[in-house]
Structures are given as C-alpha cells and as structure tokens.
C-alpha cells in the first residue's frame, strides 16, 4: 500500500458487494477455504499420531520447516514468474500457450528441486547437528529429525510439481478441481500415515506425506492432460530422468563429504554442510551440462533479464493477474 501511494495511486473503499468481481472472488475463495480446511484436518490427524512419540510433533514440524525451504526459495520463485504468463494465456483462451508455459514451468521446477532433494537426503544429519543440536536437543533427537527430513525430501519433487500444476487450474479460474485433488491427497496421506507411523515412527509420517504428494502429482497431471491436452509429457519425462541422474551424483558426493568430515561437533557439521552444498550443486550443473539439458540455458534466460533490471518488472510475457493459490498446512500461501 505505501508503494502504491508513492506511485500516486489514490485508493478508497467502495462497498459494492454485488459487483461482478466481488461475486467471482467469493465463488472462487469458497473452494480455497475448503482446500485449507482439508489440509488442517490431515495435519491434525498426523500430529495426533506424532504425539504418541516423545517430542513427535516438534520433530515433524521442525523437519517440515527444513523441507519447505528449497520449495519456498526456488519453486515458489518460478511459480511467481511463470504463473502470470499462464493466466494471460488462459485469459486469451490460448490453450497451446498455457500448455507451453505449464510444461516449461514443470521442467524448470523439476530441474532446480531434484538437487535440493538429493542434498537434503544426504546432508540431513549434519544440517540438523549444525542448526539444532545443542542444550537438551540430543544426538538421538538429531537422528530422528534427520530421518524425518530425509523422508520429506523423497517427496520434495512431487510436492513442487503438484503445487505448480495447480497453477494451471487457478489460471483458468478453477478452484474447485484443486479442492477435489487436495481432498484426494489428504485422504491418501491419512491412509498411509497409520501403517507407516506404526512401522517407522515419526519418519514414517514424512514418508506418508511424500507418498501422498507423489500420488497427487500423478493424478493431477492426468487430470490436466484431459482438461487442456498433453503438456509435452515426453520432454518432461526426459527432463525428470536426466535430473535424477545428475541428482544421483549429488547424493553420492554429498554423502561422501558428510561421512568424510563427520558431524561430531557443530563446526564439523557446518563444514560438511557448506562444502557438500557447494560441491554438490556445482557437480549437478556440470553433469546437467554434460547431459545437454536445455534447462540450464532456460533457467538463465528466465532470470538473467530480471537480475540485470535489479529484480524490477514482471516477466517477459507482460502484466497479468494470476489467482494466488491456497495456503499450505501451516497457513502460508503456496
């Protein structure tokens, strides 16, 4: 609001509840409220299960906070950049343009999230030791949190793919379909949570989360294909396969670094984490370049103009209004 005032925009309240825009917003937001409620129901069930273990809710929520970091920094940045272009294409009824932008976003999201998932799986223990293990937080606690982070990380790629895919529905001003898909995801999460919790404890709840989003991502892509046509699935599959190959190198290298340096002290854990991330991501881009992945150039072409402008302005596709997504399990917009 201050920025708008500085730009000379004059704002005033208008009580026009029958305005078409207001009615549209109410209609769309109703399903979004249902989306959030479904998330909270699943979270409530999961936390009740986690409460059966000492410190279980803390372990689950702490691991979830770590898990959200790469998604929030990278995947959400891509969504913010590409979603307006998807909305613009949908507004023009340009399904080919919508499919192209969706495919582009899915491929870039996969490309940037795979190495994060690989690094989190291998570096979970030194990360937790570096940031959490002190005072009453013991080495045993660190081990459980690290295992839970690793479980969540197995679902990091499908989680980001699922949330990005929902942007296609929001671009078409459809919030009902995301609500239905989210009900499926939460039902699957609850169904998986019980057996996996009793088998593996709190880390099993993270595995249930990962499995639920893997299933939801697959179903969402099928629904999208029926709705708008094929989103260049062959090319997306090729990107996923090559990213997983490069990610395997990251996982192996970061695991060797973590084992070599160890995490017997806070500073050792910091060193293992920092060195692992630097070398791991450098290796990922080197392998991706060797595999001739076009996403390396695509990523640079997407963000380089924005960096040169100092982050000012919107994407190259021009201004457009995109409907924001619903909130995640902790109430943040995703």
Functional labels for PLM-detected ranges:
Residues 154, 161-195:
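Alpha-helical transmembrane segments of multi-pass membrane transporters/permeases
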Residues 26, 61, 82, 94-123, ...:
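Interfacial transmembrane-helix starts/ends
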Residues 256-334:
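Membrane-proximal transmembrane or re-entrant/amphipathic helices at the cytosolic face
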Residues 121-155:
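Interfacial segments at transmembrane-helix termini and the short loops linking adjacent helices
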Residues 76-97, 163-170:
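Small-residue-rich hydrophobic transmembrane alpha-helices
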Residues 19-88, 121, 159, 250, ...:
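Transmembrane helical elements of multi-pass membrane transporters/channels
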Residues 2-39, 96, 226-241, 301:
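Interhelical loop/hinge segments that connect adjacent transmembrane helices in multipass membrane
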């Amino acid at each position: 609001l201050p920025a708008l005032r500085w730009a000379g925009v004059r704002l005033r309240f208008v009580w026009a509840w029958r305005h078409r825009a207001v009615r549209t917003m109410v209609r769309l937001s109703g399903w979004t409220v249902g989306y959030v409620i479904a998330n909270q129901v699943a979270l409530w069930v999961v936390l009740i299960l986690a409460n059966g273990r000492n410190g279980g809710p803390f372990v689950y929520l702490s691991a979830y906070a770590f898990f959200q970091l790469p998604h929030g920094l990278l995947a959400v940045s891509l969504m913010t950049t590409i979603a307006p272009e998807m909305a613009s294409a949908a507004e023009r009824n340009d399904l080919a343009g919508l499919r192209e932008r969706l495919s582009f976003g899915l491929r870039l999201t996969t490309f940037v999230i795979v190495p994060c998932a690989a690094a989190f799986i291998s570096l979970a223990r030194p990360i937790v030791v570096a940031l959490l293990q002190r005072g009453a937080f013991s080495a045993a606690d660190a081990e459980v949190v690290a295992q839970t982070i690793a479980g969540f990380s197995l679902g990091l790629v499908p989680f980001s793919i699922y949330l990005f895919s929902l942007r296609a529905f929001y671009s078409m001003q459809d919030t009902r379909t995301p609500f239905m898909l989210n009900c499926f995801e939460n039902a699957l999460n609850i169904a998986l949570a019980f057996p996996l919790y009793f088998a593996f404890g709190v880390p099993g709840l993270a595995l249930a989360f990962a499995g639920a989003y893997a299933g939801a991502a697959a179903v969402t892509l099928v629904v999208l294909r029926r709705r708008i046509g094929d989103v260049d699935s062959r090319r997306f599959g090729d990107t996923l396969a090559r990213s997983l190959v490069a990610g395997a190198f990251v996982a192996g290298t970061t695991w060797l670094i973590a084992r070599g340096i160890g995490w017997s002290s806070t500073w050792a854990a910091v060193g293992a984490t920092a060195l692992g991330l630097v070398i791991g991501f450098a290796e990922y881009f080197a392998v991706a370049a060797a595999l001739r992945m076009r996403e390396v150039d695509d990523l640079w072409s997407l963000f380089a103009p924005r960096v040169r402008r100092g982050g000012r302005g919107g994407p190259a596709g021009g201004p457009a209004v995109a409907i924001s997504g619903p909130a995640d399990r902790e109430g943040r917009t995703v």
